[in-house]
Every structure is written in structure tokens, then in C-alpha cells.
Amino acid sequence: MGGSREFRAEEHSNQFHSIIAMAIWLGAIHFNVALVLCSLIFLPPSLSLMVLGLLSLFIFIPIDHRSKYGRKLARYICKHACNYFPVSLYVEDYEAFQPNRAYVFGYEPHSVLPIGVVALCDLTGFMPIPNIKVLASSAIFYTPFLRHIWTWLGLTAASRKNFTSLLDSGYSCVLVPGGVQETFHMQHDAENVFLSRRRGFVRIAMEQGSPLVPVFCFGQARVYKWWKPDCDLYLKLSRAIRFTPICFWGVFGSPLPCRQPMHVVVGKPIEVTKTLKPTDEEIAKFHGQYVEALRDLFERHKSRVGYDLELKIL
């Protein structure tokens, strides 16, 4: 791997700033839940309704994507969050990436939250690609406060329209192909990635002529403890709301994740044949190449990073 390169974040921050950055980045979900519960329990009905009304207002307030203060906050998070775990990024063939091309990064696994993607954000500055967007569940963008912070970090709703438009505009896109259903299939003793029937991202990559890039994050499954129901109704609900309700917690039951090292590994780009209307056979061919490349990536690096979980491709 002569063109490989590794980036580490241990010297980018001190512990105080890394904790503050993590709290701002990931604390909004728990903050919203705590605010609603406290208002319902401790406030009179009129004030509780006012709190709920204000939260609803934050769902619909337009977001300035280029906000000076928003982007400054996002830079702060990207600079210091990688140090918290810490997160490292290993690129197998750094020189294979061209700054003027748009790539489709298939990031796995989803875990509770795919927070290792911070290593791929353009504001982190590890990858030699100037324009990167992360596609995320649309439910995030209906969550007060979280939608603002994550938009400034470079996340956008995962839709075919957004995906195609971004690639067409020269943006590389990071997505988790397994999505909501992968979260439903999580196990504590294995890495389950839901890929066998996930081919839409390959179709769009072929339509745009964008190379597929396998990415795996080792250690992400261990940064949160979690519990979820095990029933068909739960799966149907998750699909309906395009989000997986799950009980998760970190340090002392807080939203701060446990400090476990994460190793994000980026494989070599897989060139695809550009075609406006790819056939099912053509899609299956490149989908198979991506799945095999992801499996090989996992096997090549699991011993290097000391990972003992088994990879299961569902």
C-alpha cells in the first residue's frame, strides 16, 4: 500500500474542548427529550404548551447553510471531536482520490449513530476532497437544534433528489447504505451490515459516473450502550417514520459516548461504468464489487486495529 496515509487527531485538541464539542454535536436529542419531560412534569399546562410551541418553531425555522457563526461552530466540532475517542482515518490509496471528482462513499456500519463520519467531513480536512456532504435520515432535519448543527457540519437529507443533485454539482457524498433497517438488525456481538438488497446508491453512482468507495469504521459499535425491542411492530414503525427509536446512553447515562478508539478505513475507489439507465445486471455487478471490497477491507484491517467482532453481511 505505497499510497496509503493515516491521520490521527490526538494533538488537535485538549480534553475540555473535546467534551464540549461532543456535547454540542450529539447532545441535542437528549436535550430535547429532557426539556419536554421537565416541562410536562414541572410546569403548568400553559407554559408546557409554550415550550412545545418553541420547539416546534425550531423545526421550521429556515437554516442558513452558509451562516458565519454556524460554520465556525462546525469547525470547532470537527477540530475537537476527533480527539475525544480518538478517531483515526486510514486511506489505503490516498493518491487515487482527485479533488475535482465526485465520489460515493459507502460507509459502514450504521451502529447507534454513524458518528465516525466526522473523520470524512470536509471541515475536518483529512481527505483531499474539498466538497463533501453526508446523507442522513430525513428525521434528523425535523429535530430541533440538531437539524441546525448537523446542517452546518455538512449533512443533508438522504433523498434521491439531493443525492443526484449533489453529485451533479461536484460534491462527494457519504452515506450508510444499510440505513434504518441496519440499525434494527444490530447485535452486541457482531457487526451486521444490511447490504444485500441495498442497490439504489450503486444505481445513482452509475448514472453520475461517480466511483464507489468502501469505508468501514472499527470501534463505532462500542461507543454507546443500547437497548431496543425485538418485534415486527418495531420494524414496521422504524420503516414508517424512517428512523429507528432506540434507547441508548454513554458516559454515566449521558449522551456523551464512551471514549473508545475508532478507526475509519477508506478503501480504493471502484470505477463504475457511467450509464443513464443501468440494467439490473449492470447494477448487480458493481454492487457485488462494492460488497466484496468492503468485506476484504474489514478482513485486511481488523487485526491491525485489534478488532474481534465478526462481520455479517445481511
From Swiss-Prot:
Transmembrane annotation, as ranges: 18-38, 41-61
Top-rank EC class of the record's enzyme: transferase
Effect of loss of the gene: No decrease in oil content.
One Gene Ontology cellular component annotation held by this UniProt entry: endoplasmic reticulum membrane
EC number: 2.3.1.20
Any Pfam family hit: DAGAT
Annotated disulfide bonds: none
CDD domains on file: LPLAT_MGAT-like
Pathway assigned in UniProt: Glycerolipid metabolism; triacylglycerol biosynthesis
Any one Gene Ontology molecular-function term assigned to this protein's record: diacylglycerol O-acyltransferase activity
UniProt-listed GO biological process terms: glycerol metabolic process; lipid droplet organization; neutral lipid biosynthetic process; triglyceride biosynthetic process
Reaction equations catalysed: an acyl-CoA + a 1,2-diacyl-sn-glycerol = a triacyl-sn-glycerol + CoA; 1,2-dihexanoyl-sn-glycerol + (9Z)-octadecenoyl-CoA = 1,2-dihexanoyl-3-(9Z-octadecenoyl)-sn-glycerol + CoA
Annotated tissue distribution: Ubiquitous. Lower levels in seeds than in other tissues. Expressed in embryo and root meristematic cells.
Protein location: Endoplasmic reticulum membrane; Lipid droplet
InterPro entries in the record: DAGAT
Topological type in the membrane: Multi-pass membrane protein
PANTHER family hit by this protein: DIACYLGLYCEROL O-ACYLTRANSFERASE, DIACYLGLYCEROL O-ACYLTRANSFERASE 2
Family to which this protein belongs: Belongs to the diacylglycerol acyltransferase family.
Protein purpose: Involved in triacylglycerol (TAG) synthesis. Catalyzes the acylation of the sn-3 hydroxy group of sn-1,2-diacylglycerol using acyl-CoA. Can use oleoyl-CoA, linoleoyl-CoA and linolenoyl-CoA as substrates. Has substrate preference for linolenoyl-CoA or oleoyl-CoA compared to linoleoyl-CoA.
Protein name in the entry: Diacylglycerol O-acyltransferase 2
Organism: Arabidopsis thaliana (Mouse-ear cress)
Record gene name: DGAT2
